């Protein structure tokens, strides 16, 4: 009889602890850290053997396991299925129209997964990115030559989930985003700044050995690089979107000028990041003569 009463007391204690644990979990549901473990039962564990888990610990494990399962089912069901279906539909439509471009995106994705801190993997990723950008540029040219209206192009981009903003400048926004990343301060500034600082000494050392025309080109290169660095140095965290866009257009124009001047000296070009000397002409960013800035950027 005493044993039965003891068992009933243990069960009652476990039920009370479980109830307190559930109430605490509901109160702290949004907190990152779990609630403190409930106080141990009155039965002390045997110090000579492994400690037994209390009913409260077991209940807590079951609670967190059920929460994890709940969120996993949530993200693995309707939301994920819908997003996956939309993406697969968009990629299928793109594959029918531009199979080569889809293949390049797949290669780019694989290269991004392999990229590391070594120069070889970075070079592989950059090379793949260049091919993808060239494909995007060619695709943009084909679309422009096809006579398709901007409204039709915008609708096509929206079908691929690539629309941005209020409808203005939505033609190939992914290309603009990639170019903004490639021409950002983080990518360009460190190497360009180092080359710019070393250029004057190099020019003095090679002034007499270079043909006058080539020497002038190198001088102009140095000047353009300095202007690009000045644009990056003028950046502030509080810059408005309009200011950032205007600066991007200036940097893009200066990079085109730099491209027109040819490659920098090999002694200095070695300071450039692997694969940074991509061909801006291949991206068709300059646009037709007389085109305004927005058309040039294919934004």
From Swiss-Prot:
One of its GO terms (biological process) is peroxisome organization. It is found in: Cytoplasm; Peroxisome membrane. A lipid is attached at residue 296 (S-farnesyl cysteine). Residues 2-91 are annotated as: Necessary for PEX19 function on peroxisome biogenesis. It is a lipid-anchor. The keyword Phosphoprotein applies. Keywords: Acetylation, Cytoplasm, Lipoprotein, Membrane, Methylation, Peroxisome, Peroxisome biogenesis, Phosphoprotein, Prenylation. The modification Phosphothreonine is found at residue 236. InterPro entries: Pex19, Pex19_C_sf. The modification Cysteine methyl ester is found at residue 296. The modification N-acetylalanine is found at residue 2. One of its GO terms (molecular function) is ATPase binding. Interacts with a broad range of peroxisomal membrane proteins, including PEX3, PEX10, PEX11A, PEX11B, PEX12, PEX13, PEX14 and PEX16, PXMP2/PMP22, PXMP4/PMP24, SLC25A17/PMP34, ABCD1/ALDP, ABCD2/ALDRP, and ABCD3/PMP70. Also interacts with the tumor suppressor CDKN2A/p19ARF. Belongs to the peroxin-19 family. This is Peroxisomal biogenesis factor 19. It comes from Bos taurus.
């Amino acid at each position: 009889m005493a044993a039965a009463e003891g068992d009933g007391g243990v069960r009652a204690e476990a039920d009370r602890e479980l109830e307190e644990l559930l109430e605490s979990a509901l109160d702290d549901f949004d907190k990152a850290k779990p609630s403190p473990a409930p106080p141990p039962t009155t039965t002390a564990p045997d110090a000579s053997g492994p400690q037994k888990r209390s009913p409260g610990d077991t209940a807590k494990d079951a609670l967190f396991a059920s929460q994890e399962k709940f969120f996993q089912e949530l993200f693995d069901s309707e939301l994920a299925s819908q997003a996956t279906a939309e993406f697969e539909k968009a990629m299928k439509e793109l594959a029918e129209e531009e199979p080569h471009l889809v293949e390049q995106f797949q290669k780019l994705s694989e290269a991004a997964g392999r990229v590391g801190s070594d120069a070889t993997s970075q070079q592989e990723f950059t090379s793949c990115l260049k091919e993808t950008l060239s494909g995007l540029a060619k695709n943009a040219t084909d679309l422009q030559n096809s006579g398709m209206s901007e409204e039709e192009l915008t609708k096509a981009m929206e079908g691929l989930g690539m629309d941005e903003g209020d409808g203005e400048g939505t033609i190939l926004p992914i290309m603009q985003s990639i170019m903004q990343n490639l021409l950002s301060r983080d990518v360009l500034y460190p190497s360009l700044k180092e080359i710019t600082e070393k250029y004057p000494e190099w020019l003095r050392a090679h002034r007499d050995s270079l043909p006058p025309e080539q020497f002038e080109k190198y001088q102009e290169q140095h000047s353009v690089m300095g202007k690009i660095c000045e644009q990056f140095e003028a950046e502030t965290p509080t810059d408005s979107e309009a200011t950032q866009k205007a600066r991007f257009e200036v940097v893009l124009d200066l990079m085109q000028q730099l491209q027109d001047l040819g490659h920098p000296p090999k002694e200095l070009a070695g300071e450039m990041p692997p694969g940074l000397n991509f061909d801006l002409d291949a991206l068709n960013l300059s646009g037709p003569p007389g085109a305004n800035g927005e058309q040039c950027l294919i934004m």
